[in-house]
């Protein structure tokens, strides 16, 4: 569960290393983001000489959370870290590679481009 002021690792090669959530997109009373939700975040750590710079405001989709994710078949999945992939206004990833496992639930939210770039889909 990601809420404002939560820090996330970046799971792509867009140039950002750490993000801090500043808003969960959706309805106005939404407090938490889960896997597959879009957030507005600020870049807190960045790689030098890359397109994304520190203190830049970006959109990102949450791909991994430490909070367990319940599936319809009764299985529960949780990851070791909170991670997100930086996206543009159309919902396409800004990076060209995705690192680490990605939850299968992203397919339900039409993030198929991120699924195709991921090395492992759980």
Swiss-Prot record:
GO terms for molecular function: large ribosomal subunit rRNA binding; structural constituent of ribosome. Its main location: plastid. SUPFAM superfamilies: Ribosomal protein L14 (SSF50193). Belongs to the universal ribosomal protein uL14 family. Part of the 50S ribosomal subunit. NCBIfam families: rplN_bact. Binds to 23S rRNA. This is Large ribosomal subunit protein uL14c. The lineage of its organism: Eukaryota, Viridiplantae, Streptophyta, Embryophyta, Tracheophyta.
């Amino acid at each position: 569960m990601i809420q404002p002021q939560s820090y996330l690792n970046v799971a792509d090669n867009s140039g950002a290393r750490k993000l801090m959530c500043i808003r969960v997109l959706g309805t106005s009373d939404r407090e938490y983001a889960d896997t597959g939700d879009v957030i507005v975040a600020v870049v807190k750590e960045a790689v030098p000489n890359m397109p994304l710079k520190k203190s830049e405001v970006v959109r990102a989709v949450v791909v991994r959370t430490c909070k367990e994710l319940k599936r319809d078949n009764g299985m529960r999945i949780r990851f070791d870290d909170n991670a997100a992939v930086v996206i543009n206004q159309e919902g396409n990833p800004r990076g060209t590679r995705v690192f680490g496992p990605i939850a299968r639930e992203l397919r339900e939210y039409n993030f198929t481009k991120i699924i195709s770039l991921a090395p492992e889909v759980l």
